[in-house]
């Protein structure tokens, strides 16, 4: 029996180490926008790193797909700092590229590149849940990852 581990690549774009929070409550950028990072354990060569996309439809017909990036939004109703809502990805500073990745991307790739695959992560087309007694839309690679794990389990 084959076992796959699908891991979210994160929802903070290339700013995983900063938790995606990029501004203070007055809107001034406080993050180091030159410090790119990827998420662990998604950078492990032993997992499938799940990125995010945004699906477009025309009625019930698929009309396209783009990289998931919903831009800056407030952290929560009680935290007015802005954070980035976008698929995680990039090049690991620590993990060596696995042989299956260098075979696909070429020998010049020396560090682990992620994500490996991507699935719908946009909040607008994500999942509807009940939260505090009311409907709530969720998205992110933390939703995409278990959805794809379920699909892989059926394959």
Spans of model-derived segments:
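Extracellular protease catalytic domains of secreted zymogens
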Residues: 1-155
